[in-house]
């Protein structure tokens, strides 16, 4: 239990890295008008499988509390919890049919379900103050991690992110004075 809080976003095993359709064309992400700046991504196999039981055992061994994005994909590895987080992306008029309206995060905290709302589309920023280029295919906004740290972490907590991705969690931790 070296880390006070693990905030992780492991691969969901849904093959997002090779999507073809509205957002991906032949394995390359297309920039769509109004969705902010997006980098082009080549199809990869990073999201074909979920982490093994060994990963989950180690995560629980090294951390006191956990927040797991996409927890709904890992129910076979996670204990029951009533303290889920629902991130409402405020997708207006469902502009992109193959993106969900929100995401779920399982938590180890014995608390009520919490909802955080932030304008966001997987392709980039939508009505967001967080301008810039998305640098990872499953990039989550810094604001989201700032909100999580304010609600679930204590000063001087040691934070773990096993799947750093774009580094949004690290930026939020740095800004909030967390290690």
Predicted regions span which residues?
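Class I S-adenosyl-L-methionine
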Residues: 1-8, 12-44, 60-179
């Amino acid at each position: 239990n070296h880390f006070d809080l693990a905030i992780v976003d492991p691969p969901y095993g849904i093959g997002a890295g090779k999507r073809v359709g509205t957002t991906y064309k032949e394995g390359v992400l297309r920039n769509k008008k109004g969705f902010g700046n997006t980098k082009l991504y080549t199809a990869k196999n990073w999201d074909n499988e979920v982490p093994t039981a060994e990963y989950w055992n180690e995560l629980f061994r090294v951390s006191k509390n956990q927040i797991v994005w996409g927890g709904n994909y890992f129910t076979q590895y996670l204990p029951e919890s009533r303290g889920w987080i629902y991130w409402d992306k405020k997708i207006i008029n469902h502009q992109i049919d193959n993106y969900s309206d929100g995401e779920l995060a399982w938590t180890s905290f014995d608390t009520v379900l919490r909802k955080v709302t932030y304008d966001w589309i997987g392709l980039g920023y939508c009505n967001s103050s967080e301008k810039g280029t998305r640098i990872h295919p499953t990039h989550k906004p810094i604001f989201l991690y700032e909100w999580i740290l304010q609600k679930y972490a204590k000063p001087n907590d040691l934070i773990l992110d096993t799947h750093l991705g774009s580094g949004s969690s690290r930026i939020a931790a740095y800004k909030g004075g967390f290690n």
